C-alpha cells in the first residue's frame, strides 16, 4: 500500500502537526515502510497459535498478572491534595490545543 502526500497531510492535521515539505516527504517514506512491514506480518501463518493477552518475557507466565479485585476509589479531596491548581472539585490545567 502506497501512502499519498494528501494522506500524510490529513494525518498531520488530525495530530495538529505543522510539517515542512521535507518532513512530509520523509513521513511518506517512513509510513510506507511501516505499512509494508505490517502487510508482511499479516502474511504470517498463525494457524494453530493460541491468542495471547500479553507479550511474554523472561519470567513466569503469570509474573505481571494479579487478581482483579475492587478497591475503594481515591476521594476528591485526596486527589486534589497535590494538584498545582484546582477549583470546584476539578483539576485546572493549561490549554494545550488551539483550534
Swiss-Prot record:
PANTHER family, sorted: GLUTAMYL-TRNA(GLN) AMIDOTRANSFERASE SUBUNIT C, MITOCHONDRIAL
Domain of life: Bacteria
E.C. numbers: 6.3.5.-
GO molecular function: asparaginyl-tRNA synthase (glutamine-hydrolyzing) activity; ATP binding; glutaminyl-tRNA synthase (glutamine-hydrolyzing) activity
GO biological process per UniProt: glutaminyl-tRNAGln biosynthesis via transamidation; regulation of translational fidelity; translation
Subunit annotation: Heterotrimer of A, B and C subunits.
Keywords: ATP-binding, Ligase, Nucleotide-binding, Protein biosynthesis
UniProt keyword annotation of Ligase present: yes
Catalytic activity: L-glutamyl-tRNA(Gln) + L-glutamine + ATP + H2O = L-glutaminyl-tRNA(Gln) + L-glutamate + ADP + phosphate + H(+); L-aspartyl-tRNA(Asn) + L-glutamine + ATP + H2O = L-asparaginyl-tRNA(Asn) + L-glutamate + ADP + phosphate + 2 H(+)
Family statement: Belongs to the GatC family.
Organism: Solibacter usitatus (strain Ellin6076)
Listed transmembrane segments: none
Name of the molecule in the record: Aspartyl/glutamyl-tRNA(Asn/Gln) amidotransferase subunit C
Any Pfam family: GatC
Stored NCBIfam families: gatC (TIGR00135)
UniProt enzyme class: ligase
Described function: Allows the formation of correctly charged Asn-tRNA(Asn) or Gln-tRNA(Gln) through the transamidation of misacylated Asp-tRNA(Asn) or Glu-tRNA(Gln) in organisms which lack either or both of asparaginyl-tRNA or glutaminyl-tRNA synthetases. The reaction takes place in the presence of glutamine and ATP through an activated phospho-Asp-tRNA(Asn) or phospho-Glu-tRNA(Gln).
Amino acid at each position: 500500500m502506497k501512502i499519498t502526500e494528501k494522506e500524510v497531510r490529513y494525518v498531520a492535521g488530525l495530530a495538529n502537526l505543522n510539517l515542512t515539505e521535507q518532513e512530509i516527504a520523509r513521513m511518506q517514506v517512513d509510513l510506507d515502510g511501516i505499512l509494508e512491514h505490517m502487510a508482511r506480518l499479516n502474511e504470517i501463518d498463525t494457524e494453530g497459535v493460541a491468542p495471547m493477552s500479553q507479550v511474554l518475557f523472561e519470567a513466569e507466565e503469570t509474573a505481571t498478572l494479579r487478581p482483579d479485585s475492587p478497591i475503594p476509589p481515591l476521594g476528591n479531596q485526596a486527589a486534589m491534595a497535590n494538584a498545582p491548581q484546582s477549583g470546584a472539585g476539578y483539576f485546572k490545567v493549561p490549554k494545550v490545543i488551539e483550534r
